Amino acid sequence: MQRQTGHMEDKKRTGLESQGTENAFSDGRDGKDGLLHEGINEPILIPSTIADLEGIRELVRKFRGRLLPFEKCPDFCLRIGGLEASFHKGQEELLEYCEALYLPQPVKMEIVGIVDDVPGGENLPCSIAVDTIKSRHHGSLLTFFSHYH
């Protein structure tokens, strides 16, 4: 079954069309000290200095509500934010379950956004496991979305 709506229609429905998706995590630098994530249509500059969950939390607070389309599935967008604006509002234990159950060893994670309108009518939370990414890539944060649940 194919989706009938695209991400532009999703933006209009959520009222976020004026915020745009371009360079959502740009910190104004020229990119030499940041890393580009290539999994979306518009590159996102993630400063290479972000090495902990507090840095990720700050980016989520700063860009809450931005819509980022997925390159390989443009009908879906990641809406930056936490559980508070989703189907999972009030289910803070969901993050704790994911930290304990989804990876071979427990890892602290942060919810970075929600994918709306997935089949089944729920929102799909996306989180990042910074410790796992750092250890796999010799201390560098090379990818933004490390884990979907």
From Swiss-Prot:
Residues 1-15 have a biased composition (Basic and acidic residues). InterPro entries: US22-like (IPR003360). It comes from the Viruses. Residues 1-32 are annotated as: Disordered. This is Uncharacterized gene 97 protein. It comes from Gallid herpesvirus 2 (strain Chicken/Md5/ATCC VR-987).
